[in-house]
């Protein structure tokens, strides 16, 4: 009777556990829907036989002529670039003298626009460019190619944010220095903070610094969506002018992503076209309200949504970290898309950092690499847990399989382990599980006790749990203490969810028993 009372207490406790657990899990789950765009970091231009033939034929004529014209213009640009950067410091502390601004900049802009015209670019400008007093910062999106540098020319060579290494490139370095750039040192761990402070000091300064142009996405995408904006342009809390980029061409030859055409291929294909259309649209200046001034994330998201609406594109929470995960997935012999999890959303909602998610990717790869599509099926799931395919296992698998397509991708795996298998009350779940498995109540679980309980749970009378028990207890141990049990369950959280499910079944069974008289 004492034993039955203990089980009733367990059932009552389980009711409280469910209340604690469900609200948080439901709120997190609602905000973790799959992204509207699967992979914004790849691009594959499909050339028809006719398009390929035209590109080859026109390329043999146009490429040599265009390259010759561009080289000639660059020879003219070289002395202008040298003259414009004489005695200019790499990291300026005050605005340049007015003669550089009024005499050299217009010549520089004219020659650069002429060079892009020779390359076949027909540039259409919409809207009105704001003055520095109206908007100290331009935010330009979507960023999809190195040809987006045209936006810098159209905007009148405002200051850009660039890596210090780019300044050392001949001619390109002089072009960057002329804009009085905000330079980033990748090797400096405080680089992000330093850059943010430099942008803030310039936009708040009473000196006549040029406007700053920033690509807030921070990397090239395929223009199918707007990914997460970095906060550098929005932290100062000053008005910004959104600038939209479009390439309304029948054949897309300009897009340059991590996985797609190389830079050389993009250049050759683009130079082989009769012309390449580009639109640069200056949207109305966006002035942040008081809440947005205090919250850069809110400010960035509002501007991003406005730009996405104007472009008629969706927004996703992919970021640069997703791109790194995609590359890591490829190195682990998984499809590159396997690494895409919408890092910004996942990290914020589930409180995971880069190291956590990268560790999850390594574990996921060890399970999924044997499957054909780089996803975990029910068979791989069963082998990973060393348990037979049964109804409880299928139920657990379906909890991970959020889109119910019969497989678990990496995003579902991360969400499942974090939301489903790591409830806020994990310690209570493990304590109750251990008590249920410890049939003789001696403080230890033996292989026989584990076998008895799991056979009952899975409905498999000949279930062999020796491998699982050895993995839990160690090769030379015949019993498992609570400390060992807890360490194993925390290291393999999918088991914690199975134990949780088993407690639910026990609670339901106890509630169905007739009451005591």
UniProtKB/Swiss-Prot annotation:
Coiled coil: none annotated. GO terms for cellular component: endoplasmic reticulum; membrane. Ca(2+) 1 binds at residues 401, 403, 405, 407, 412. Its EC number is 2.3.1.-. GO terms for biological process: phospholipid biosynthetic process. Residues 388-423, 425-460 form the EF-hand domain. It comes from the Eukaryota. Ca(2+) 2 binds at residues 438, 440, 442, 444, 449. It is found in: Membrane. One of its GO terms (molecular function) is calcium ion binding. Pathway: Lipid metabolism; phospholipid metabolism. Probable acetyltransferase. This is Lysophosphatidylcholine acyltransferase 2B. It comes from Rattus norvegicus (Rat). The gene is Lpcat2b.
């Amino acid at each position: 009777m004492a034993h039955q009372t203990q089980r009733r207490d367990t059932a009552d406790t389980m009711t409280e556990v469910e209340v604690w657990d469900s609200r948080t899990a439901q709120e997190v789950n609602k905000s973790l829907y799959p992204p509207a765009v699967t992979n914004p970091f790849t691009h594959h231009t499909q050339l028809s036989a006719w398009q390929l033939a035209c590109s080859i034929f026109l390329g043999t004529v146009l490429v040599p002529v265009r390259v010759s014209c561009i080289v000639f213009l660059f020879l003219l640009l070289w002395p202008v670039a040298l003259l414009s950067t004489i005695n200019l410091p790499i990291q300026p502390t005050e605005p340049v003298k007015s003669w550089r601004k009024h005499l050299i900049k217009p010549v520089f802009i004219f020659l650069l626009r002429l060079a892009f015209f020779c390359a076949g670019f027909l540039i259409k400008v919409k809207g009105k460019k704001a003055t520095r007093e109206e908007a100290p910062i331009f935010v330009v999106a979507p960023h999809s190619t190195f040809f987006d540098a045209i936006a810098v020319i159209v905007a009148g060579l405002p200051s850009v944010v660039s890596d210090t290494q780019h300044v050392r490139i001949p001619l390109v370095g002089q072009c960057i220095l002329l804009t009085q750039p905000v330079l980033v040192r990748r090797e400096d761990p405080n680089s992000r903070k330093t850059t943010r402070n430099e942008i803030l000091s310039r936009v708040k300064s009473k000196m006549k610094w040029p406007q700053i142009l920033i690509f807030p996405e921070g990397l090239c995408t395929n223009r199918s969506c707007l990914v997460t904006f970095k906060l550098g342009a929005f932290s100062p809390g000053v008005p910004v002018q959104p600038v939209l980029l479009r390439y309304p061409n029948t054949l897309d030859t300009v897009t340059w992503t991590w996985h797609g055409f190389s830079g050389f291929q993009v250049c050759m294909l683009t130079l082989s076209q009769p012309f390449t259309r580009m639109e640069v649209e200056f949207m109305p200046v966006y002035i942040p309200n008081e809440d947005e001034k205090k919250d850069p994330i809110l400010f960035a998201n509002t501007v991003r949504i406005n730009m996405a609406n104007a472009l008629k594109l969706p927004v996703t929470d992919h970021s640069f970290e997703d791109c790194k995960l995609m590359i890591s997935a490829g190195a682990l012999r998984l499809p590159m898309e396997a690494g895409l999890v919408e890092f910004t959303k996942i990290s914020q909602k589930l409180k995971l950092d880069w190291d956590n998610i990268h560790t999850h990717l390594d574990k996921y790869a060890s399970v999924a690499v044997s499957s054909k599509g780089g996803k975990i099926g029910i068979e791989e799931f069963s082998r990973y847990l060393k348990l037979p395919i049964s109804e409880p296992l299928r139920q657990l698998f379906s909890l991970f399989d959020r889109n119910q397509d019969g497989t678990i991708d990496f995003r579902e795996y991360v969400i499942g382990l974090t939301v489903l298998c790591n409830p806020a009350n994990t310690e209570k779940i493990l304590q109750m599980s251990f008590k249920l498995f410890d049939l003789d109540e001696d403080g230890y679980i033996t292989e026989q006790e584990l076998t008895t309980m799991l056979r009952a749970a899975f409905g498999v009378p000949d279930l062999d749990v020796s491998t699982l028990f050895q993995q839990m207890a160690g090769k030379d141990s015949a019993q498992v203490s609570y400390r060992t049990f807890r360490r194993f369950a925390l290291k393999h959280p999918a088991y914690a969810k199975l134990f949780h499910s088993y407690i639910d079944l026990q609670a339901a069974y106890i509630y169905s028993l007739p009451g005591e008289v």
